[in-house]
């Protein structure tokens, strides 16, 4: 079987996007390996999974969280997730409870050469760089995720779908370089540990909750550096690294682009769901969003602001989102897909808010998602009339 060179420096968006993911996943599911030129890593052989509930995972009217919540009590955080985003609950991350549960520390702890201190800082033992990552959940680093999984275990009925998230290789690579690793080693190890966590979490959910679909997001706040020309590695290398992380997953995947991050790079890596802030800056990427929707992709609209007061009503965020949709439609996006192929989330994590504020932001997102679901039902009735 011949594959187009998806790692070629001149590969365009049509190759580097959804086509890339189809190729990568077909390679993996065939039980073969392919070495990626930019970082010299091999996508490992993984077992072929039987068809599950994932094909019907995404439906109009879903809301979820980005990840972080302000709570110190993991059970309380999980209760908020289950109550405010019941159709797509998310595993909370609790950095205020412990710096070890910060978005860098909780994932790099799987690297044998990394020591995470109580304050979340990293130190490197370079003699252990050649050792494989060993992902394992522990109460110090993953209290929110462990409490979430326990709540699902004891629930009388599991949700149809859940969302988990892992910090991506670009963001982890920058952190590892700052901790003292050479750039090439830092990003190579970041890719290895991100892929290891993706496989570990998916296998865990599949084994424990086989009837529950998984949406697995890769969080990449560092994408803002590529948007503003401050990239630590080349664009094509970054696409290779992020695409390789997505490719080891058999579940539905997403990439969260925080704030003014590079949505074009995220799209080029080929996620099923593209998470962006629902602001006027999204109009600069209208062509990318159009291609993503045309390829049957979904968008997670970060429509509830996290950098200013939300207000008591859904009306303000809803009007802003509808206005954005209208302008995107004028710029070529399909008017039905732009409304119905979307989730609603807060713009970013909620760890910096009070507990009541965080719950309120999730509640606003849920009410907005309900409106999208109602519109989708109305559209189907109109078509069938």
What role is predicted for each listed range?
Residues 172-186, 217-233, 302-311, 345-354:
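Active-site-proximal beta-alpha loop/turn segments in soluble metabolic enzymes
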Residues 27, 33-183, 297, 325-333, ...:
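Alpha/beta catalytic barrel-like cores
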């Amino acid at each position: 079987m011949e594959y187009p060179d998806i790692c070629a420096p001149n590969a365009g968006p049509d190759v580097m996007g959804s086509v890339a993911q189809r190729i990568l996943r077909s390679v993996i599911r065939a039980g073969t390996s392919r070495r990626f030129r930019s970082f010299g890593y091999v996508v490992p052989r993984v077992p072929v999974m039987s068809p599950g509930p994932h094909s019907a995972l995404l439906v109009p009217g879903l809301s979820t969280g980005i990840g972080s919540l302000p709570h110190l009590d993991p059970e309380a955080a999980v209760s908020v997730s289950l109550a405010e985003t019941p159709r797509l609950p998310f595993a909370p991350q609790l950095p205020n409870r412990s710096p070890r549960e910060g978005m860098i520390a909780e994932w790099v702890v799987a690297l044998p050469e990394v020591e995470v201190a109580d304050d979340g800082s990293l130190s490197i033992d370079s003699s252990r760089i050649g050792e494989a990552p060993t992902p394992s959940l522990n109460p110090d680093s993953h209290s929110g995720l462990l409490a979430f999984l326990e709540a699902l275990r004891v629930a009388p009925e599991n949700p149809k779908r859940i969302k988990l998230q892992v910090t991506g290789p670009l963001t982890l690579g920058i952190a590892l370089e700052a901790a003292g690793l050479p750039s090439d080693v830092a990003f190579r190890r970041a890719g290895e540990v991100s892929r290891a966590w993706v496989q570990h979490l998916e296998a865990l959910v599949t084994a424990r909750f086989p009837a529950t679909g998984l949406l697995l997001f890769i969080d990449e706040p560092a994408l803002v550096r590529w948007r503003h020309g401050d990239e630590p590695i080349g664009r094509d290398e970054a696409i290779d690294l992020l695409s390789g992380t997505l490719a080891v997953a058999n579940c539905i995947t997403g990439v969260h682009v925080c704030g003014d991050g590079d949505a074009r790079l995220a799209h080029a890596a080929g996620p099923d769901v593209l998470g962006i802030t629902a602001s006027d800056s999204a109009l600069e990427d209208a062509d990318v969003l159009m291609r993503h929707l045309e390829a049957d992709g979904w968008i997670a609209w970060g429509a509830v602001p996290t950098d200013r007061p939300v207000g008591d009503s859904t009306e303000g965020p809803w009007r802003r989102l509808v206005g954005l949709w209208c302008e995107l439609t004028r710029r070529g996006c399909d008017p039905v897909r732009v409304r119905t192929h979307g989730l609603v989330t807060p713009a970013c994590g909620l760890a910096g808010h009070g507990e009541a504020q965080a719950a309120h932001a999730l509640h606003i997102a849920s009410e907005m998602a309900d409106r999208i679901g109602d519109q989708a039902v109305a559209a189907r009735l109109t078509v069938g009339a």
